[in-house]
Amino acid sequence: VSTQVFPTNADQSPLSKLGQQIALAGLVVYVLLAPHSIAASATAVVIAGIGWLIRTLGTGSLGLRRSKFDLVIVLSLLWTLASALLSEEPRISIAKLHASWCVFLFYLARAILNKRSALYLVALLIVSGSAGALYSAFDLVRGRGVVVEVIANNSPLHQVGIQPGDTIWRIGRRRIYSVADLDQTLKLTQPGTPVTVGITSRGEQVERPGLVLTPAQHQQPSPSGIIGSNRNHQFRASGWTRHYQTFAELMQMIALLALGLGLAHLRNHGANRYFRVAIVAASLLTLGLVFTAMRTVIVAFVVGAGVIAWRSLRGNYRVVFTFALFFVLAFGAVVVWQTRDRNSLLLGDPSSSLRMQVARVGLSRIPVHPIFGHGMDAMKMHWTEWGFPGKDMLHLHSTPLQLAFDRGLPMLVLWLWMMILFWLTIARAARSSADLSDTNSYGILLGTLGALTAFLVSSLVNYNYGDAEVAMMFWFLMGIAASTDSDRSRGRSRSS
């Protein structure tokens, strides 16, 4: 990798240069794997962190300046710690504190990247996300799992509520494509050891734990006890990830990054090759998003794309783009209608009804612990006791509501303060960089602004801030935006 990509303070010694190279290599691996695997991408972040540490030892400096975000981030972390200590279930909530490490990506990106290296990483992220979108299309054509036609009375799969018409697509971490595949996988499990079954039922994907085979069932020629010959071609796409909701949120943010870069070039240079490449990538990523049939995330994407278009396009371009967004909504509606419960478009499906019931119970319990909340993940131990319906949800499906419930109303105020601060800062930075000489920085900031907008809209009805892969991507993009703006501002100061 060219040393021109590095911040200048990394060239002071061989040790600092080595650390910078390791850190940048770790971030390259992260963006390549972030749309697909949390374990591999988290490992890449650890490698990048080690590189940052080596560079710090070589330079004697973290390479960070104070920012306007530091205070609210520190206060949020401290409040989260206090909430965990005062939780209804301290042992569970304290163990959950490890999820707060995602904010490390914000400071890592700020310390390691400049606007040029940020552009390279964004480009790699878009390429990797596009590969995931293409795989989703292939996965839909190929089909997934096995559709249950008949289930025997003595089938162990009754333990997890399997019914005719359901699709079994995963046992533990292994994907299933036929009854023979299912039987072979069950025979590889240990008798008496519970495993989790991935199921698609009425268009909804759930993971149901608790399947246990007896030694006698384990020895049967067909331990599954089901008959089925077809794969499911009408499931909610999830790429190489485990769940469609995670995949949808990631596709949404990456698609808006690509769109921001494309429309920045369209505004400043017309329909050049960079615009064409970016708009093709954005279209692929949008297709991957729509195939998840996530109603709220599709709507959030359209809102985020609308913000990007409104701030970058003029005249006829706005009209054309508005029609394109209506097409996305219409196509999304068709996919939702084909994939999910027929009443999903009118919010009359069981999933929507359950969400409303859960939200009402959650709201009614916030006054019980309004300051420090009930504690992160404490509801998993008291779901039925506290009056929540069902057994598959186990969270409130709303980031603001979940934060208030888990960590108290002050945490919700801190989160709103932080989100508003990010939005206003990135919006001002994008506006000031909208000139011919800084198109790529403008595109990154514009795309990040759209991604942040969509993330916030989606957060109203999805607990996306509690999804580790999505939270990592959120903090990484905020770090890229801060790094791009800081590097751009320093360059402008030097030129003046």
What is each of the regions a protein language model found here?
Residues 105, 112, 258-337:
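Hydrophobic alpha-helical segments of polytopic membrane proteins
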Residues 1-92, 102-105, 111-123, 165, ...:
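Transmembrane signal-anchor hairpin modules in multi-pass inner-membrane enzymes, especially those
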Residues 222, 232, 337-339, 345-360, ...:
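Long extracytoplasmic/lumenal interhelical loops at the membrane interface
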Residues 262, 272, 409-453:
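Hydrophobic transmembrane alpha-helices and their immediate junctions
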